[in-house]
């Protein structure tokens, strides 16, 4: 049960046991009666501030269709994060924040990471989200946001040009945009927990700089896993198509991965006998542009990320040294003090 919990992005034990009882995702029935274990990373990662005063109010139509009503907000990371470059030399460019979109009908999440919090980049996120929705014949009709960057003229003008209505929550009243706020809380909690788990086992390699990968991985697991009480995933509800990805396709975030050398992948012989037949990379999620069994692997030497199929996962992290308390404590302190500090609201709603 604990191993599945790690693989499914620290999904609640109760959800995993419910899937086991329902015979979903090839989870053995014995899992449904396991004693609930303790996950140390969850104990650290789920620590939050006190909830805001007052109730969380839902806005929008009672029974919307996908695209009818979407909420959007900005996630401030607090720590620069890796940009997934696929070629070239290591770069000092980093992501600093993300724009998060939540469709209220399906609870499907769209995340765009950004280098700057500018109107131009935020508008580009909106355009990309609209293209994604249009691919499945969904049209964004109403957008709900807070003020700030979403009140800029270019964003407002683009909404008007596309015949979209646009409403705002009150200044400082984040809970009036409660749907996206609580899902940002969900993503940051899961991402923080995955990072802490990975750093605990591999502190010399995993750092808070991996947060963009962790956020994207958390969103992808959410989108392709049924919510509590649902038989379809948020992705299936939004796209109205059978999901080609299941929780079984995911692996433990940040675990070591052995990638077959390119020559051997191409069916060629190794040019030099002294060269290794594989290299060790870091699992940072599944590729959104390939088959469900193609993983995204971060190469620590080149700092590049690539989709890989011929891989072996070390999900129990048995092939690397995991004992460096000083580095681990430093990273835990950095995550606790700086990462995702602007999004710690607790809502009583069930957002899983």
Model region roles, listed by residue range:
Residues 4, 16-19, 39-42, 73, ...:
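Mobile genetic element proteins and their domesticated derivatives, centered on retroelements
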Residues 145-161, 166-192, 206-219:
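RNase H-like two-metal-ion nuclease catalytic core shared by retroviral integrases
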Residues 2-6, 40, 68-72, 81-90, ...:
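Conserved, well-structured core segments
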Residues 218-264:
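Acidic, glycine-rich loop-and-strand cores that form catalytic or ligand-binding grooves
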Residues 88-97, 111-137, 303-304, 311-319:
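Active-site beta-loop-alpha junctions of metal-dependent nucleic acid enzymes
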Residues 1-2, 6, 11-44, 49, ...:
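Retroelement integrase C-terminal DNA-binding domain
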Residues 28-30, 58-62, 83-92, 100, ...:
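Beta-strand elements of modular eukaryotic interaction domains
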Residues 44-115, 120-122, 266-270:
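An active-site-proximal beta-strand-loop segment
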């Amino acid at each position: 049960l604990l191993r599945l919990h790690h693989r499914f992005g620290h999904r609640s034990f109760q959800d995993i046991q419910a899937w086991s009882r329902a015979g979903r995702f090839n989870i053995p029935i014995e899992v449904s009666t396991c004693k609930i274990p303790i996950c140390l990373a969850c104990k650290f990662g789920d620590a939050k501030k006190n909830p805001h005063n007052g109730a969380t109010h839902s806005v929008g139509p009672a029974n919307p269709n996908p695209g009818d009503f979407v909420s959007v907000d900005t996630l401030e990371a607090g720590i620069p994060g890796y940009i997934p470059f696929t070629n070239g030399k290591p770069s000092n460019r980093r992501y600093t924040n993300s724009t998060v979109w939540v469709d209220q009908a399906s609870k499907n999440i769209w995340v765009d990471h950004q280098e700057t919090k500018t109107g131009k980049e935020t508008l580009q996120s909106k355009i990309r989200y609209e293209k994604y929705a249009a691919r499945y014949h969904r049209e964004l009709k109403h957008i709900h946001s807070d003020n700030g960057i979403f009140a800029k003229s270019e964003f407002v003008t683009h909404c008007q040009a596309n015949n979209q209505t646009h409403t705002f929550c009150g200044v400082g009243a984040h809970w009036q945009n409660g749907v996206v706020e609580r899902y940002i809380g969900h993503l940051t909690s899961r991402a923080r927990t995955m990072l802490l788990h990975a750093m605990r086992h591999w502190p010399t390699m995993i750092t808070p700089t991996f947060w963009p990968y962790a956020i994207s991985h958390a969103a992808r697991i959410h989108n392709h896993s049924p919510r509590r009480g649902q038989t379809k995933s948020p992705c299936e509800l939004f796209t109205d198509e059978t999901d080609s990805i299941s929780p079984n396709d995911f692996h433990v975030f940040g675990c070591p991965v052995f990638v077959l050398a390119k020559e051997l992948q191409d069916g060629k012989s190794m040019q030099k006998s002294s060269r290794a037949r594989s290299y060790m990379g870091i699992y940072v999620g599944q590729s959104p542009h390939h088959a469900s069994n193609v993983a995204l692997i971060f190469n620590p030497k080149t700092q590049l990320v690539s989709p890989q199929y011929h891989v072996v996962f070390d999900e129990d992290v048995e092939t690397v040294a995991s004992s460096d308390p000083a580095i681990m404590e430093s990273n835990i302190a950095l995550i606790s003090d700086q990462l995702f500090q602007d999004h710690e609201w607790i809502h009583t709603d069930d957002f899983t």
